[in-house]
Amino acid sequence: MRKSYRIKSEQDFQTVFENGESVANRAFVIYVLPRKQNKHFRVGISVGKKVGHTAVVRNRLKRYIRAVLTENRDRIAPDLDFLVIARPYAHDFDWEKTRENLLHALNLAHVIEEMPNKEEK
């Protein structure tokens, strides 16, 4: 995922966090804010120390999240800024479990409209 698809500044994070709608499942919280001036969606990813006490665990989960978003970028509306915040429940997820739970949360938030079949990969 290119850096232009990422929310980096604290001000942008705060704007989405304070003004966006939130949806959650056990593993992820999604904050969504529609933005008309976007050429493509932007995403911020947060995996705190409560999720994984070591950087290895946190970075692996962030890598999985970015991979799921890259895999599904054609299905994500271009006029959105959204945050993906991992909850401690996700600390030991493998690729498949991360994909399944993140797609469920994105579907609940109407970032992705339909769920893919389990056979699709």
Curated annotation (Swiss-Prot):
One of its GO terms (biological process) is tRNA 5'-leader removal. It holds the Pfam family Ribonuclease_P. Keywords: Endonuclease, Hydrolase, Nuclease, RNA-binding, tRNA processing. One of its GO terms (molecular function) is 3'-tRNA processing endoribonuclease activity. It is an enzyme of class 3 (hydrolase). GO terms for cellular component: ribonuclease P complex. InterPro entries: Ribosomal_Su5_D2-typ_SF (IPR020568), Ribsml_uS5_D2-typ_fold_subgr (IPR014721), RNase_P (IPR000100). Gene3D superfamilies: 3.30.230.10. Its EC number is 3.1.26.5. It catalyses: Endonucleolytic cleavage of RNA, removing 5'-extranucleotides from tRNA precursor. Belongs to the RnpA family. Consists of a catalytic RNA component (M1 or rnpB) and a protein subunit. RNaseP catalyzes the removal of the 5'-leader sequence from pre-tRNA to produce the mature 5'-terminus. It can also cleave other RNA substrates such as 4.5S RNA. The protein component plays an auxiliary but essential role in vivo by binding to the 5'-leader sequence and broadening the substrate specificity of the ribozyme. This is Ribonuclease P protein component. It comes from Lactobacillus delbrueckii subsp. bulgaricus (strain ATCC 11842 / DSM 20081 / BCRC 10696 / JCM 1002 / NBRC 13953 / NCIMB 11778 / NCTC 12712 / WDCM 00102 / Lb 14).
